[in-house]
Amino acid sequence: MTTIAIFTKNVLLAIAFALFAQGAAIPDPAKRDDNPGFVALDFEVTRKPLDVNATSELSKRSSPSSPLYFEGPSYGIRVSVGSNKQEQQVVLDTGSSDFWVVDSSASCQKGNCKQYGTFDPHSSTSFKSLGSSFRSIGYGDKSSSIGTWGQDTIYLGGTSITNQRFADVTSTSVNQGILGVGRVETESANPPYDNVPITLKKQGKIKTNAYSLYLNSPGAATGTIIFGGVDNAKYSGKLIEEPLVSDRYLAVNLKSLNYNGDNSNAGFGVVVDSGTTISYLPDSIVNDLANKVGAYLEPVGLGNELYFIDCNANPQGSASFTFDNGAKITVPLSEFVLQSTANACVWGLQSSDRQNVPPILGDNFLRHAYAFQLDKETVLSRSGEVHFCLKCFSNLETSIVWKAFFYNRYIQ
């Protein structure tokens, strides 16, 4: 989910973690420190057809207009809250920064907001109310959440953090709680507070405020987020560092877009957001590519138009996104053909001009990028191909590679 003001994420297309090239030895896992400096969590992918009949997720956070809403995949992480470890599944969101859960007595304004777990603050002996009200940053589809701020112990896999600030939501039109891992500048509170990634670092669970996000293949049921590290099985070669171009959101500068040999100069900032299903770029780029693959504009109500494409279309080739420091991310054009609730498929690269939103690179791009370093305000992107191997983790601060014997399934 993304704020519209200046969507940007700290994007690092990373300096290599190639200790092998430097002759460094891999530490023996049996002698592994109890705190390797990273926290690895799997998340579950929930998929729905793209809904083109409502207002947009992209108009969140005070957008001047309401573009169309695309309810695509969401990424659910299991966390536990409180002294009695009350389990929730919350949506992982790189475009927002607050962590909130659904109260056990909450009023659900839309759907069943309690289906993924609830929190009863009265049953946790470690819960402390902070006595102030919470209201989520506004969404263009009119969804919202209200509640109160509190703090408690949060359990993330085998790791826990204490006195973490979060919101206990008592009324919501959102179907699930949210774990926002964006920058503190997009928090709902003023002044800002230490959100989950910052607390993980301050309490010594990770060595740097960074995370790598692996969305896996388009049809996969799971993905992985690693706070404080990267998975070396997910890339070859090096990671290239790209600086953020906003002091508020996770955004980098897109230099050019090449598709099947045709090059379009860009030279503008793009937001990178896991909460946005598709990608949005200016008319000058989108229209040309749409014509080449056979996508066509159709009215969809409320004065909006969208690009659709025949669901049987199988556009060949790829789109390559090049950034300022030379990072190049290649996405197969076939991944831009997305099922929807309409009679045709939605083309996954829409016009930011027509939708009146900033340029955004969503899930169909992020799947091919990799890591975010919030401390250094950069994004890390993988270069080269991904190979089958056991998952090997690198601490982003020390670049020491651990063979993760405790996490031993092969990449699929």
UniProtKB/Swiss-Prot annotation:
The active site is at D93, D273. GO terms for molecular function: aspartic-type endopeptidase activity. It comes from the Eukaryota. Residues 1-25 form the signal peptide. Gene3D superfamilies: Acid Proteases. It catalyses: Preferential cleavage at the carboxyl of hydrophobic amino acids, but fails to cleave 15-Leu-|-Tyr-16, 16-Tyr-|-Leu-17 and 24-Phe-|-Phe-25 of insulin B chain. Activates trypsinogen, and degrades keratin. Residues 26-61 form a propeptide. CDD domains: SAP_like (cd05474). Keywords: Aspartyl protease, Cleavage on pair of basic residues, Disulfide bond, Glycoprotein, Hydrolase, Protease, Secreted, Signal, Zymogen. Its EC number is 3.4.23.24. The keyword Electron transport does not apply. GO terms for biological process: proteolysis. Disulfide bonds join C108-C113, C311-C345. O-glycosylated. It is found in: Secreted. Residues 75-383 form the Peptidase A1 domain. Pfam families: Asp. Glycans are attached at N53. Its main location: secreted. PANTHER family: ASPARTIC-TYPE ENDOPEPTIDASE (PTHR47966:SF65), BETA-SITE APP-CLEAVING ENZYME, ISOFORM A-RELATED (PTHR47966). Belongs to the peptidase A1 family. This is Candidapepsin-2. It comes from Candida parapsilosis. The lineage of its organism: Eukaryota, Fungi, Dikarya, Ascomycota, Saccharomycotina. The gene is SAPP2.
